[in-house]
Amino acid sequence: MNNQFEVFRPNSYTYDVLAKQYTETIASSGHMVLSHHGFYKGNLNENKLKNGKGTFLFPNSIYSGQWNSDKKEGDGTLIILKPQKIQKKSSQSKSQQQPPSQTKKSSSPINLSPRLQGQNPTITTNGSNNNNKVNIESLINKLNDKFNQCEELINQTSQEEFLKQQDYYNGKWINGKANGIGCFHFSKDDSMHYDFWRYGVVIRYANQQNILKPLYDDSVPAGLLNSREILKDMMEDWKSVVVGDDDFPCTRPYLTTPTASISLNRENINIYSNNNSNGTTSPTSPSILSPTQVPLSPPKVNTAPSTLISEDDNNFTSGSGFCSPSSSLSIKMSSPISSGLQHSKTQPNVSQSQNQQIQQQQQQQQQQPSLLVNSTIVQTNTNNNKFNDLLINQRNQQKILKKQLLKSNQQKQSFGIITSNYLKSRLENEEKFFMTLILFISKWEIPFKSFNIPNNPSIHASFLIFVPDTDNCTFISLSNLIMQSNVLERLIFKLLIDPMSKVLNSTALNTLTESQTLGNLSTYNNNNNNTINNTISIGQSKSANSSPNKISPSVSLVGVSSLTTLPSSTPEERELHKLLPICLDLDETPHIEKECIASILNIFKLFPTIEDYQPPQFIPDTICKFISCFKKTRALENYLLQKQFQMSKDYFFKPTATTATPNNNNNSSGNSKLTTTTHLTNNTTTTTIVSGSKTLKRTKVTPPSQSSSSSSPSSDQTNLPSIAISSSNGISYKSPPVTSPPPTKPTFSVSLTTSNKIDISASNPNGNGMKLYGSNATTTAASSILNNNNNNNNNNNNNNNNNNNNNNNNNNNCGQRRQTVESIFPTFKQQSNTDLLTSLMQSTSISLSNKYSSSTTTISTVDQTPPELTLQSLNILLSQFKQSYLFPDSITLSFNYLTKQKENIEQMEKIIQSKIQLIQETKPKQQQLQQQQQKNLLNYSSSFNEYLTNHDNLIDSILIGLKNDLSQLQKSFEICLTLYKEMITQQIQLVLKRLKSAHSFINQLIGLPQSRVSKLPKDFIVRFIKHTHRIIYQLYNSANNTFIKLDNEIKIDIDEFIVQSNDLFSKLPNGAITTNGTTMNSIPSPVSPIGSPPLPSISASVYEYFLGKKSSSSLTLNVSQQQQSSNSLDRSSVQFEPSDITPGPFSFISPLDKIIEEIMSGHYQLILPVASSGDDLLVSVVSLGLIDLRSYLSSNNRLKEISKSSLIQLFNILLHSTVICHNINSYLPEVFKTLILLLPFYPKKDELFIKYKEIFIGFMELCVIDELCGFSFIYLEFLGLLVKPKKKGLRKELKKEFVELFPIQLFIDIMEKPIVDATNKNAEKTRAQAAQILINLSISSIECLLEVKSKNALGPILDICKFGQAFAHTQIEESELQILQFLGEGALAEVHKGIWKGKEVAVKIFNEGSFSFRLEDFLKEVAILGLISHPNLLKLKGACIAPRSHKSTFMIVTELMHKGTLLEVINKNKPLSLEDIIKYALSVAQGLAYLHSVDFIHRDIKAANILVDKNNNAKVGDFGLSRVIDNNFNMTAVAGTPKWESPECLMGEAYTSASDVYSYGMMLFELATGDEPFLEIQSIVELARSVCDKKLKPKISSSVPNFISSLIKDCLHNSPKKRPTMNQIIQKLCNHKC
């Protein structure tokens, strides 16, 4: 082991570090470093920062994995240590083995400057002073001992048994936090849970869109269209919530000066070193540094170091072994908020009192002028005593600070993984953190009305944060975590025992205790003659010196609207007034809620406070624990379920709501004026009856049959003012305008209007305003854009730094591409609820307006008949209904708690009474004292009396305390009893209101027409009634409990509701329910209520009908815990009524690591919220998942099996996601690759183009601008499929519109754009795809082909085809062909008859073994056959191009010409009739005329290359020698058969269309005579001499008709210019034919 230690300082650090190099397993970059923050073993980079693989021991955790510049980056594991389970074998140091004489401290200083000068300081055993050598060795032994202990612990962490006992995370890390897919291990149940992590927390997606819609509607869910960058914004807010949560809270403070501990010995002072400007270290003069001076800690941070070599070596790893100063850091943040629960930036810190103590001690140290002693003082004998005193003083101060730091180290850090324990610790230790977290939850999870920060109602898709709960081995949401915190209980505790936290008039209390009992507090409040705006709180009265107590607004939060609260303005009451509606399930009608809270708080204030008496903590704790029984345990689940149920009701029933303005005017006449108000709230719809000036707390419940609306559970829309809230922690809140619930399935008639068609000029740096697309587009415009784009790219590259050229290019390009996407779709970005894409994505008909204006998109809705109820939808509604209307568990819990409390109090009373009796008996009586005085013979009576009196007083104080304890104990039970009556009364009233809403919904079901419920069982309504029947039965039992009697009014309300609901209950199998005022003897005992699931659970058991299998588990809404196996999707399900439910996977709250599996299972709507999340990491995960989706769809012919409706929905969703997602690098290419796979099976391509052409324009602009990103060639391939010829693409009219939007010249410019960077493979692919689009357009339209020809683009297209980069044919697999009999052969190929797709075809198989075969010729012939299309040209069916091997084949598949070649027809039917001659000649002439019109020259026209079908139609074939006429150069004469070639071709001159006319004349000679021309000539030399020099012509028989003979002579004219054109030949043949 290397014993040499070095002290160095990285450039970014403000202090030195102590390190030790090791070489056993790692190269020279391996170091071990010890610090106050922990111990590191691993690699360091050239800047001495952690880089590469390494392990760091934090105070309470261990990270092992990849590092990047001091940040956890890459793959790694964080172990959350359990200190009590860490077994560490401490090795015996060498200093302990040495004799005391050798370890004795020397009194003379050590001079280490020779080893420190000019290099990093080191500590070795090679000292020059023998007297100090032993001391240095002892120091090094101590350091080695520490390093060995840490290494031992690191080795222990790699053991499987050790890991099994720890909670740990294993996965991806970015910037020191868990980011990406990772798994978390719970040690208690040894389970692994895979999730998607972001910034140290788990992110899951809550599908709040109506799940019934996918059953009926294949279009894109409209509610998801407006969601953009939700996750990105949420995580930015989350970073503000947990601000300051770093691994090393200071500026790079992962190590501090190691000499802080060494300086305790005067002999070791010279180890200090200073930081030079260049980042190196140099030795300093001997000095003593205070704990607050540099380099011990960075400036402006209050901290104090713990020693590396602690005086108590045994405490090194005992929870605070590393003594991290981070826990004591506290950067003060100023805040204008004075309340105890205020919103502010918070970070982990110690309590304020601890900070103040540390600051005071530091100030005292700084005020000591002699604390910093220079070297001259140290070396002066006269100052030795003073130096020693200061040294001792410093040691004592360090001990004090160390103890404080050890205490502050209990404040936990997350170290990249935020757990529930971490958040709870911050909630308990930071007063402001609770408000910060509440505001975050109110914005992103549950809109808390008391804080007036609801989340955006237009966001139907939201992401939720979950954190691991190591105590319960599950994941818990933030809203449920808040309910588990003790903030509410702490405030109640303070309100109970602190007399300054409550204002209670003693006169009112006396009056109350004399005239009212604790059991009639609610009656006392209801009998007040004041209105709600002038209510006197319970326990208070008007005094002569005070104004009437009114419910006044409290002190507002920053930007939050005022809230009415109690007459008192104490902070505790104001905060409880805000927290009680959050934590308790209260009636959310505003004035009823205020009254309920006022009653609760005033009951708390009845707890007496006795002067000079502090009650035992357990006494007020009983009240706090009792209130905890009423806290919400499933806040998030209930909110999401109620929201989902409301959406389901709106989907099946037209939303109706009765609203009225509350009557705020007092009725002085006393006449009862009734005003009914319906309030839509988060939990329920509450109806309040206001009678004159008196507000009744109890509401008479009207019969369900008389109700006209169903509005419970409530929607999340609340009539709150729209305000902007800016908090000090950086989270911005703005309450959006209230929107109505989504209507029932509408029919849209859309008129689209935009300001302008998106044109390329928006991104043109020259700003010339030229449009790229449209009928007015010009070639110059497209060319200039491409040139400008090249210039921009070059300029950007030239402006980058040389050192970081590649990185800067990538970053700049990414930023520019993102800005480009946002600029391309400005219309889509600006619109919200009336989004253009909302209309584009509808499945109904859409009319596009040709006139564009600046107005927004208008959507007119037409009512449509609601969907029919099926068995599946009924079961979903039933499950939602049961989960939305539940019997409160708090009633049972509170009752059980109260009964146990009564038993405990009775026992305590007996014990206290017995103690009081015993103590009273021990007190001496007065008679005994007098007798003792008489017997006292000495004069000690006064002393004796004083002694006895003091003891008597002590006994009296004990008696008073016990009596007070007994009184407080009794009072606490009375308060709990009163609270029980108050809370149960409120709960029963709230449940009755919700049951009224439930029965209204049931009546709606009963009133449905038979046509909508024809598929349902006759008794389907009974299932709903059974559930409400069970709840009312339980309410009845609770109200009639003999142990605690409630008010008779509550019982009357329940009886009245039963009577009013008798019609519904009569439908139950047991018949009608009867009641005799207060009895319900005829009600059968229902099944016990459904138990509540564990607190942190949230899974999708509401919708288990989608899941793959069935079970008999209870209908509870469990939050989805990940399956331990990461390879399979959670298929747990619930048995519904009935059980015949179509299986299929679905999760209400989806773990994002399973998002691809759910998408592959058919839930394509989940793509949109992920794509629009704005989180690049999550989008990249889905991008990789799309690869698996394509593989899944491609295998086993799944694309052919998928339904058309599902395919349309998937296609539309993917296409829409490309607009709302701006991730060009990974997402857009993968999406369009998937669209390319789906497009051939898309049944409505014409409608697709009409809907999305505006989007296609935008992406075409992006394609032109952003070629280097790898998106251009993919998008061009997509467009190429869209314009495929015939029925595979758009119809002919839409292709014309396509060409108007995307001019031909645009694709020609892309195809001919020079490739500057040879390494850019995408550029070549882009050229090929542009050529492919031109090919498809040319095949589909002769006009496009002529335009391509006129722009001289056919040659480049064929060149691309020649190399197999583009194809003008259908690609046929060899396995698809069935080769039959042989038909013939030529020089390069043989022809067979074949079968393809059940039809007869001709298969031309090229002979690869032939020396003359060239693949280029084969591909060229295929391309020519594919490009041209004419009735008199051989029709190409496709081609088979197999990989070149010894078994490979290259085949062309054409239509089968049954009669063979024209030569064979001539030979069989010689001589031909004039009619046949004219027919064949005219057919060939028409085919050649078409070829010449598109600048093709056949170059081998003869009877052997003309084919005849069964209808005697002649068609030109064998295009192997065809060439494209290029005006820029002459074609060579190396062409077809010499005897048929023109004289100029034989002479080597240019080959033109006139050459084909000459060959056509020779073919006409064959038709007329039946003979081959120039039979007498046998050599090419003789042929050339005869034809070129002698002007020899073939001899025409006299039997040939004159006009045929004349036509032959004209075609064989020696001068090409005097030969007729093919069109002239056609005219002559047609004239003679007529």
From Swiss-Prot:
GO biological process: signal transduction
GO terms for MF: ATP binding; protein kinase activity; protein serine kinase activity; protein serine/threonine kinase activity
Uppermost EC category: transferase
UniProt feature, compositional bias: Low complexity: 89-109, 120-131, 273-292, 318-339, 352-367, 658-688, 703-715, 787-813
Region annotation Disordered: where it falls in the sequence: 84-131, 273-367, 658-750, 783-816
A single cellular component GO annotation: cytoplasm
The keyword Transmembrane belongs to this UniProt entry's keyword annotation: yes
Reaction(s) catalysed by this chain's protein: L-seryl-[protein] + ATP = O-phospho-L-seryl-[protein] + ADP + H(+); L-threonyl-[protein] + ATP = O-phospho-L-threonyl-[protein] + ADP + H(+)
Residues at which ATP binds: 1383-1391, 1404
UniProt subcellular location: Membrane
One Pfam family recorded for the sequence: MORN
Polar residues bias locations: 110-119, 340-351, 716-732
UniProt key word Nuclease: no
Domain Protein kinase: 1377-1634
Alphabetized SMART domains for the sequence: MORN, S_TKc
MORN repeat residue intervals: 40-63, 169-191
Enzyme Commission number: 2.7.11.1
InterPro entries for this protein: Kinase-like_dom_sf, MORN, Prot_kinase_dom, Ser-Thr/Tyr_kinase_cat_dom, Ser/Thr_kinase_AS, Ser_Thr_protein_kinase
Membrane topology: Single-pass membrane protein
Key words of the record: ATP-binding, Kinase, Membrane, Nucleotide-binding, Repeat, Serine/threonine-protein kinase, Transferase, Transmembrane, Transmembrane helix
Active site residues according to the UniProt entry: 1500
Transmembrane segments: 1255-1275
Chief location: membrane
Family recorded in the similarity comment: Belongs to the protein kinase superfamily. TKL Ser/Thr protein kinase family.
Protein's name in the database: Probable serine/threonine-protein kinase DDB_G0282895
Protein's organism: Dictyostelium discoideum
